[in-house]
Amino acid sequence: MAQWKNLAFLQKEVFFESRAMEEWLIEMRRSIHRIPEPGNKEQKTSSFICKMLEEMDIPHRSYGTAVVGLIEGKEPGRCVALRADMDALPLEEPSDRPYASLHHGYMHACGHDAHM
């Protein structure tokens, strides 16, 4: 039963932390949404991700267009791996929104900009 109380506490913490970062998170997603790139050609996207990781003091390495960040816990034990696709779809974005795709013929139409 105690583990469920801890889970509820954690859910509340995540909720409040994400609310505090909401405007920043929206701007980051929109920034990524503006620069969709085809698979294995995500140069601008991977550079953007590296810049964000640097600003958050998260150690990282680039492998071509792939980026790996390392977030270590305070205690030894189990770990979690998170993965996010960065590629865009070859579609024209029919939008006049200020964060619409700047790359003709490509768009993040499947939510990858939210994954990152």
Q: Where is each model-derived feature located?
A:
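DPxDG-like acidic metal-binding loop motif
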Residues: 116
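Acidic/His- and Gly-rich active-site-bordering loop/insert found
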Residues: 4-108
